[in-house]
Amino acid sequence: MDKVKKAVLAFSGGLDTSVILKWLQDTYQCEVVTFTADIGQGEEIEPARAKAVQFGIREIFIEDLREEFVRDYVFPMFRANTIYEGEYLLGTSIARPLIAKRQVEIAQQTGADAVSHGATGKGNDQVRFELGYYALQPDIRVIAPWREWDLTSREKLLTYAEKQGIPIEMKQKAGSPYSMDANLLHISYEGRALEDPAAEPEESMWRWTVSPETAPSEPEYLDLEYERGDIVALNGERLSPAAILTRLNQLGGKHGIGRLDLVENRYVGMKSRGCYETPGGTIMLRAHRAIESITLDREVAHLKDDLMPRYAALIYNGYWWSPERKLLQVLIDESQVNVNGRVRVKLYKGNVMVVGRDSRTDSLFDPDIATFEEDGGAYHQADAAGFIKLNALRMRIAKALRRC
């Protein structure tokens, strides 16, 4: 095994990464730097510092990345109306590039020659992290313990922790019926009780949203203001990106918005069942399409829709730092220059309904032309005959030749 001098570990302080930290020290005999990112997972992260100190870690990085996460990753993704396989809003996928970037930057700052993560050898996250590492520092050494060790179950992890004297809180020992991951965009649930795709999840599983059945009986209206494709104000109050998403999560959760139960195709080849809560993101997606509907040229909007599945797959599969994703982002961002205005939505029992949209500066909606009433000659209906005949020409020729 090649000698590793120092490794930067993505460290949550939970069971898995606590075991990994000790395993790295024992197996590689290397110095470990811990990096803990606050991306809105809603958990106390300072205990990770205390645990790292217990392991004798001298270089401990704990960073609040919530604003950067939403501003530089979530918002750019939503400019494309991104959905994977028609349903998934990519809450886990979009968080990995930022974590990978900071790990590499910390490695460069501290002189580390390796990085390590706690993703399993079965999932997509190992790919997402490592594609990011290699894209940002091609010669970095990657240590993926789940692909090396024989600790293949939770029970084995707990046994190892006990033997090594690794402090594990009672709630970590008790575990959860699900494997969960959270950030400001979503919370996900996988594995264990969800491995039967035919079984309905228990209501107690959902943490961010109330059931639509028990949501308030009165609707709630929201006004969202857009500048260059991004939300900048909510109900007239200008807020930071992270504050906007936090507030939308609260409002969406209150009205039972954003629950999803799906089977997705993982990049590594298997199908996986997952449940997600993305209340704020669900509102954002619906509202963004609404503001685009009056500010984007038809062909630009259709081109974006054509490119979106490819863009979504790049993010899902871990290619955020690839040249093709960056190229698509330039195109997407250029399309948003005139996406300015206001959208009004109604939240009611799991539904997000667009009830109004306007743009004082960039609307392409012309009421004089679109009206069903007298238009004063703005649109000459007789002109449509030639348009229709020319577009029908190829079909008329084919019919004459009995090809259709």
UniProtKB/Swiss-Prot annotation:
Keywords per UniProt: Amino-acid biosynthesis, Arginine biosynthesis, ATP-binding, Cytoplasm, Ligase, Nucleotide-binding
The encoding gene: argG
Protein residues bound to ATP: 10-18, 37, 118
Similarity section: Belongs to the argininosuccinate synthase family. Type 1 subfamily.
Listed name of the protein: Argininosuccinate synthase
Binding site for L-aspartate: 120, 124-125
GO cellular component: cytoplasm
Subcellular location per the Swiss-Prot or TrEMBL entry: Cytoplasm
Upper taxonomic lineage: Bacteria, Pseudomonadati, Pseudomonadota, Betaproteobacteria, Nitrosomonadales
UniProt-listed InterPro entries: Arginosuc_syn_C, Arginosuc_syn_N, Arginosuc_synth, Arginosuc_synth_CS, Arginosuc_synth_type_1_subfam, AS_cat/multimer_dom_body, Rossmann-like_a/b/a_fold
Gene3D superfamilies from the UniProt entry: Argininosuccinate synthetase, chain A, domain 2, HUPs, Single helix bin
Pathway participation: Amino-acid biosynthesis; L-arginine biosynthesis; L-arginine from L-ornithine and carbamoyl phosphate: step 2/3
Pfam families linked: Arginosuc_syn_C (PF20979), Arginosuc_synth (PF00764)
Domain of life: Bacteria
